[in-house]
Amino acid sequence: MSTIEPIEYRRAGLCQWFTQSPGRSLLAVESYALRAVWPSLFSKVAVQLGCAGPVDLLEACNAQVRAVLDLPGVASTPVARVYGVPEQLPFDSRSVDIMLLPHTLEFADDPHQVLREVSRVLTPEGHVVILGFNPFSLW
């Protein structure tokens, strides 16, 4: 029997952590950094893969359409929600201008497949923004 928790529990645990003091502090820093990045990126469609707790990390993004893709039952932002898994994105090829991956790769069952899917749905001039923990830091 495997000791690895199903992705639903890991993602829900991360979303719960984002509601606590250390998680809120991290989200504040990440949100501030993204606000500086978004104005330089053109976007009609922006998609966030995975939960970032109660914070809308795409809020300052100038995209006409913004959505969050996450697992059913995982609490997320008030932005439009799409349910699915990052390893099988429910989007057409070359249909998304910006893909935001907030700690998505650390919690994915197959991070390489997530990146292949992101590459598939990204427009030719699209952008990928990856947020992640430094494995060599205290966090």
Label the model's feature ranges:
Residues 1-40:
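Class I SAM-dependent methyltransferase Rossmann-like catalytic core
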Residues 32, 36-89:
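Class I SAM-dependent methyltransferase SAM/SAH-binding core
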Residues 97-112:
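A short SAM/SAH-binding and catalytic strip from SAM-dependent methyltransferases
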Residues 87-99:
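A short acidic, Gly/Pro-enriched loop at the edge of an enzyme's catalytic core
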Residues 127-139:
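Conserved class I S-adenosyl-L-methionine
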Residues 112-127:
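A short glycine-rich, Lys/Arg-flanked "PGG" loop and its adjoining helix->strand segment in the class I
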